């Protein structure tokens, strides 16, 4: 159902794993 977390938190609105196809959603990074 829900997208998986890519990282525990976002850093200044960006994901640590952003280049792996993740997006910052609220305070979590979610898989696109």
UniProtKB/Swiss-Prot annotation:
Matches recorded under SUPFAM superfamilies: Cyclotides (SSF57038)
GO biological process: defense response
Post-translational modification comment from the UniProt entry: This is a cyclic peptide.
Cross-link (Cyclopeptide (Gly-Asn)): 1-32
Disulfide bond entries: 6-22, 10-24, 15-29
UniProt keyword terms in alphabetical order: Disulfide bond, Knottin, Plant defense
One Pfam family here: Cyclotide
Domains: entry comment: The presence of a 'disulfide through disulfide knot' structurally defines this protein as a knottin.
Function: Probably participates in a plant defense mechanism.
Recorded family membership: Belongs to the cyclotide family. Moebius subfamily.
Listed name of the protein: Cyclotide Hyfl-C
Source species: Hybanthus floribundus
Upper lineage: Eukaryota, Viridiplantae, Streptophyta, Embryophyta, Tracheophyta
């Amino acid at each position: 159902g829900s997208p998986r977390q890519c990282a525990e938190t976002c850093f200044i609105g960006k994901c640590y794993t952003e280049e792996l196809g993740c997006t910052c959603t609220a305070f979590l990074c979610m898989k696109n």
